[in-house]
Swiss-Prot record:
Residues 52-77 have a biased composition (Basic and acidic residues). This is Protein BFR2. The lineage of its organism: Eukaryota, Fungi, Dikarya, Ascomycota, Saccharomycotina. Residues 86-161 form a coiled coil. It comes from Saccharomyces cerevisiae (strain ATCC 204508 / S288c). It is found in: Nucleus, Nucleolus. Residues 27-148 are annotated as: Disordered. Involved in endoplasmic reticulum to Golgi transport. Involved in a protein-transport step blocked by brefeldin A, which disrupts the Golgi apparatus and its incoming protein flux. May also be involved for mass growth or cell proliferation. Present with 15400 molecules/cell in log phase SD medium.
């Protein structure tokens, strides 16, 4: 089909000035085809002018740049000429470089863990070795052996350091666990001591002599006797178990020297005397071990805190070793024993008056007997009234029981333990509360950023805002139902508040006022000047 005139004109108008070549066209494929022979291509053949011309046949002719002409650049300078080469040689160089890079990466991966723990001196040595190897052009076998030996040494050092760190962490963890166990044991002992305080107080009420015990048994019932026997068995069992525990403990820590005798004592039934004897022997063996342990740990604590270095605080009581402090406290044993014999609760044992009157208590002499022996002259002064009699006291006895050698009362020591325990509980509670307060404060700060839940319709008095007042604790309103004021008293009270006086004879005032008015009217009539029919 022939083209119309308009199509022919448009083809001529659109036709480009320079001829366009399609690289995918088979006719023009020879222009863009590279013929390689023996590893050499046509691109590397600069002598073939025909190929150059064919390749540049579709280029436009452009004049030289003015800038290039001004600067006078000479592109034909021999320094800009390249070196002849082939693709095969290029590929061989690339493959060699890739192999070297892979080997270096493998070696770096092997030595990465070891080289991470190098010191500065080792890094400098390695850098010097690398520079020498680069200068030589390759690594020798000796350098590889040295590097291998160095990596082994570094690995060994890292393993030792890791083992030391793990051992120190385990040691610290075991110390912390042992400290927690010690504090738990100490708290349990204090709790047990506090629970036994009631039993210690009740034991002071028991009879003091065998005669009073026999007399009490005669008055007791069968149930009471049975309970006494059961308590005696439990008491002996408890003491035997305590002594066996102490023997095992001292054998385990090598405190007891004679192990065979100690093992023989484990399976032995003891009487009351034997219990006291073995308790004393165990205490004497434990004393040396206790002083050594206290001295050891007190010196460690003082050296860690740095108090030992200060000469001014060296001789203070609180900075002395723990064993010395214990010995100082126990040195005045008579004073400590006297404090335990103070009868702070005014407890009187059963049949105490009778035992004292019959002279069964040699450590305690009745003031009645003492006055009769010493003061024969004052026999008429009333021997039944003791010297320590105080009429202001409700519980006056015939005997001075403020200091009783047959009573054991360590309430002052018990109160110290109780106060320490309470302070510890309070401090723990405060710590937990402070942690909770910090958590709540952080939550409050985070909540401040959020939109608050506010009732927008509660403004301008449309809703009444109120809060319920808590009831007053331990408050009771006065009850006035038993006695009430009369109306006259109420009027007089309020009139007195206002500074006035109230006359309660209201009828008499009215009569007097009427009488005065009548008298005034009579006088007015008498003094009138108007006369009728005068």
């Amino acid at each position: 089909m022939e083209k119309s005139l308009a199509d022919q004109i448009s083809d001529i108008a659109i036709k480009p000035v320079n001829k366009d070549f399609d690289i995918e066209d088979e006719e023009n494929a020879s222009l863009f085809q590279h013929n390689e022979k023996n590893g050499e291509s046509d691109l590397s053949d600069y002598g073939n002018s025909n190929t150059e011309e064919t390749k540049k046949a579709h280029y436009l002719e452009v004049e030289k740049s003015k800038l290039r002409a001004e600067k006078g650049l000479e592109l034909n300078d021999p320094k800009y000429t390249g070196v002849k080469g082939s693709r095969q040689a290029l590929y061989e160089e690339v493959s060699e470089n890739e192999d070297e890079e892979e080997e270096e990466e493998e070696e770096e991966e092997k030595e990465e863990d070891a080289l991470s723990f190098r010191t500065d001196s080792e890094d400098e040595e390695v850098e010097i070795d690398e520079e020498e190897s680069d200068a030589d052009g390759g690594e020798t076998e000796e350098a590889q052996q040295k590097r291998h030996a160095l990596s082994k040494l570094i690995q060994q050092e890292t393993k030792q350091a890791i083992n030391k760190l793990s051992q120190s962490v385990q040691r610290d963890a075991s110390k912390g666990y042992s400290i927690l166990q010690q504090t738990k044991l100490f708290d349990n002992i204090i709790d047990l001591r506090i629970k036994l305080q009631k039993a210690v107080i009740a034991a002071n009420k028991l009879p003091l002599t065998t005669e009073s015990w026999e007399e009490a048994k005669m008055d007791d019932s069968e149930e009471t006797k049975r309970l006494l026997k059961e308590n005696e068995k439990l008491f002996n069992n408890l003491f035997n178990r305590l002594i066996n525990f102490r023997i095992k403990f001292q054998l385990g820590d090598h405190i007891t020297q004679n192990e065979e005798v100690a093992k023989h004592k484990l399976s032995k039934k003891r009487s009351l005397k034997e219990l006291y004897q073995e308790t004393n022997s165990l205490d004497s063996e434990l004393k040396e071990y206790r002083t050594a342990v206290l001295n050891k740990w007190s010196t460690k604590v003082s050296s860690a805190s740095g108090n030992a270095a200060l000469s001014s605080n060296k001789f203070k009581a609180i900075n002395l070793p723990a064993d010395v402090q214990v010995e100082n406290q126990l040195s005045d044993m008579s004073r400590l024993m006297k404090r335990t014999k103070l009868n702070r609760r005014n407890i009187t044992p059963l049949y105490f008056q009778k035992d004292c009157a019959n002279g069964r208590l040699p450590e305690l002499i009745s003031p009645v007997v003492k006055d009769s022996v010493d003061d024969n002259e004052n026999s008429d002064d009333g021997l039944d009234i003791p010297k320590n009699y105080d009429p202001r006291r409700k519980d006056n006895n015939a005997i001075d029981i403020t200091e009783n050698p047959y009573v054991f009362d360590d309430e002052d020591f018990y109160r110290v333990l109780l106060n320490d325990l309470i302070d510890k509980k309070i401090s723990n509670a405060h710590n937990s509360e402070s942690a909770a307060i910090t958590i709540t404060s952080t939550n409050a700060r985070s909540n401040n950023k959020l939109k608050k839940n506010i009732d927008t319709k509660a403004s301008k008095g449309r809703k009444l805002n109120y809060s319920v007042q808590d009831p007053i604790a331990n408050y009771e309103a006065p009850i006035t139902s038993g006695y009430k004021w009369s109306d006259d008293q109420i009027d007089e009270f309020f009139a007195g508040l206002l500074g006035q006086r109230v006359n309660f004879n209201e009828n008499e005032d009215e009569e007097q006022h009427a009488r005065i008015e009548n008298d005034e009217e009579l006088e007015a009539v008498k003094n009138d000047d108007i006369q009728i029919f005068g």
